[in-house]
Curated annotation (Swiss-Prot):
Keywords: Amino-acid biosynthesis, Aminotransferase, Cytoplasm, Pyridoxal phosphate, Serine biosynthesis, Transferase
Chain segments annotated as transmembrane: none
Source organism: Bacillus subtilis (strain 168)
Enzyme Commission number: 2.6.1.52
Pathway participation: Amino-acid biosynthesis; L-serine biosynthesis; L-serine from 3-phospho-D-glycerate: step 2/3; Cofactor biosynthesis; pyridoxine 5'-phosphate biosynthesis; pyridoxine 5'-phosphate from D-erythrose 4-phosphate: step 3/5
Protein name (record): Phosphoserine aminotransferase
Assigned protein family: Belongs to the class-V pyridoxal-phosphate-dependent aminotransferase family. SerC subfamily.
Main localization of the protein described in the UniProt heading: cytoplasm
Modified residues (N6-(pyridoxal phosphate)lysine): 194
Alphabetized InterPro entries for the sequence: Aminotrans_V_dom, Aminotrans_V_PyrdxlP_BS, Pser_aminoTfrase, PyrdxlP-dep_Trfase, PyrdxlP-dep_Trfase_major, PyrdxlP-dep_Trfase_small
PANTHER family linked to this entry: PHOSPHOSERINE AMINOTRANSFERASE
Catalysed reactions, as listed in the record: O-phospho-L-serine + 2-oxoglutarate = 3-phosphooxypyruvate + L-glutamate; 4-(phosphooxy)-L-threonine + 2-oxoglutarate = (R)-3-hydroxy-2-oxo-4-phosphooxybutanoate + L-glutamate
HAMAP family for the chain: SerC_aminotrans_5
Cofactor list: pyridoxal 5'-phosphate
Amino acid sequence: MERTTNFNAGPAALPLEVLQKAQKEFIDFNESGMSVMELSHRSKEYEAVHQKAKSLLIELMGIPEDYDILFLQGGASLQFSMLPMNFLTPEKTAHFVMTGAWSEKALAETKLFGNTSITATSETDNYSYIPEVDLTDVKDGAYLHITSNNTIFGTQWQEFPNSPIPLVADMSSDILSRKIDVSKFDVIYGGAQKNLGPSGVTVVIMKKSWLQNENANVPKILKYSTHVKADSLYNTPPTFAIYMLSLVLEWLKENGGVEAVEQRNEQKAQVLYSCIDESNGFYKGHARKDSRSRMNVTFTLRDDELTKTFVQKAKDAKMIGLGGHRSVGGCRASIYNAVSLEDCEKLAAFMKKFQQENE
């Protein structure tokens, strides 16, 4: 079977080796006589999967000992509510850097629980860049929230701010795509369905000391401390999604770890951005060059009809997921960790040929 090249924004491409291993273990996991999907979350077989996923995250990301790792449900969208529910108090303000739709959603949820402030925004330029951040007025804030990569607009933080208050990052779309200093953040969270595995599990990495500030009057299942104490087993976890997460992390380790994948991601992005920049305006990048994402390459063509033709012809060539979001229009190539350099070279060759045929 010829595999389709998957440029979807999420759920996104998974490594073929991971899919093949999951296929092999789907019926009989480790000679247990059961599918991995049938394992009790209290069994020793699943416990090994659970702990393996945690230990691989610690190893690959260099997570310090003073952090907890949680596997939760509800997607990153639930974190938009859980964070202020647990950590925003009446006398404090949650500060936001607005860089796209996901920042807007996080801000909207936080407003339901307390005071918020927009520290910086690039909304007036349709979120085409990461704004400069002045942190002089946030010293008494509850936390500063950022979105590390913006899938819709194709922008990404190149350097993270040195925040005088707790720094919280939604890293759903670029976690483990590059080396970061975890110790700069009090909370990192992200849905798995872009770089970590299939949809269904949300990874939360939280500084242990931050739990001391947790609000008391919160439903038990929505308290972070509940899940820390239960090792993410307070209720039945998404066992298959966590199993797949462990396989993806294992694949990443076997392929050189984060340092190697970061180099590959830079090469992949450069192939596509060079194609855009050398097209004499046939393709126009949405993101400013100093804010370009290595995960989501966004670009427009001269009109909607040409864009539709581009997307359809790409689909005919077994490349899917290239339609842009309505906020930007045009096209978007999501090139997460599992998308290969060869996949990006195939797309670039298609783009050059399409330009020659339609100029």
